[in-house]
């Protein structure tokens, strides 16, 4: 009796059999029945899927299919430079959805295989932004997965099938629509084989992941767990056909240009035997990456089967100073425009001098993180200002100069003239 008073009873989920210590929550029903939170989510997903089958479907394919020129023009609004990569992606995406439209209309006399895309380029060159912009333009489900988190099935890490769950979630659970979406796999270069020669230690996050990805890249029905994380035998998997999913893989592939240079005949020359000096390194890298071929990827550590499933390769070039300056101000989502809008919500006008922009670009280039470094630099410069502005209601303008960027001086804050001041008095200036 004493033991039962101090030891609470153990309750089990009537569906999966786990007790209250193994789940987040147990819900009590009539007749001593219990159901855990995970089984509730699973049953809700099953019911919602059945209801979707009975309800009218949203259009699976994009309602309109822009031509390659229109796709490239749209990309130009958001991504600076990378003209060759834009053209390659515009053609590949147009052909992919044109193929799906033909299939939907019953035109199947010739079987056209899909062309997945491999983006090769340094960090911050626009790989992810290109894929995101394409998906947003076409209004198709889009998801991003990180290849570094993937491991071969049976090992600690994320199974390759679970990345498809993100695409289902992006389609609001509509599996049919998700099967026509775009999945971007970032950091794909990190799953390269660790060495040219097979090791006695199993490479579960390198070649093992490449092997596991082959089926979903090629196209076929894959069983996707309805919830990420721990699996249990009672869960019902979601059949997912990847045949019509467009896979875009991207990676920095650091060091790849060295092998391309060796293949071209000399590590120090390119083209007409011209010696490449230090100041020409950026242009050299641009030219070399544009010459990447399957042999280079094989040497980098990718198995032939994986390379064969990524037939479209687009090289993105490193961003130079001029491109970085344009990224700051020209695109629709330009970084300076974003922060000007952010401060405008606090009724403050942000001004950035031309010299300050050059200094921001120099700081980003020194960090070697591409366009991402621009946002980091601006965020650091404006951190204190954005912290204080909501408390200082008399500030009307914030000015960033080159000294602010290079020397760490505080941005100049222009304050509103006090209502008690004489008419016509100029606003006071305060460096804070």
From Swiss-Prot:
It comes from the Bacteria. The keyword Translocase does not apply. Pfam families: AAA_2, ClpB_D2-small, zf-C4_ClpX. Residues 412-432 are annotated as: Disordered. ATP binds at residues 122-129. GO terms for molecular function: ATP binding; ATP hydrolysis activity; ATP-dependent protein folding chaperone; protein dimerization activity; unfolded protein binding; zinc ion binding. Residues 1-55 form the ClpX-type ZB domain. Zn(2+) binds at residues 13, 16, 36, 39. The keyword Metal-binding applies. GO terms for biological process: cell division; proteolysis involved in protein catabolic process. Component of the ClpX-ClpP complex. Forms a hexameric ring that, in the presence of ATP, binds to fourteen ClpP subunits assembled into a disk-like structure with a central cavity, resembling the structure of eukaryotic proteasomes. ATP-dependent specificity component of the Clp protease. It directs the protease to specific substrates. Can perform chaperone functions in the absence of ClpP. Keywords: ATP-binding, Chaperone, Metal-binding, Nucleotide-binding, Zinc. InterPro entries: AAA+_ATPase, ATP-dep_Clp_protease_ClpX, ATPase_AAA_core, Clp_ATPase_C, Clp_protease_ATP-bd_su_ClpX, ClpX_bact, P-loop_NTPase, Znf_CppX_C4. The gene is clpX. This is ATP-dependent Clp protease ATP-binding subunit ClpX. GO terms for cellular component: HslUV protease complex.
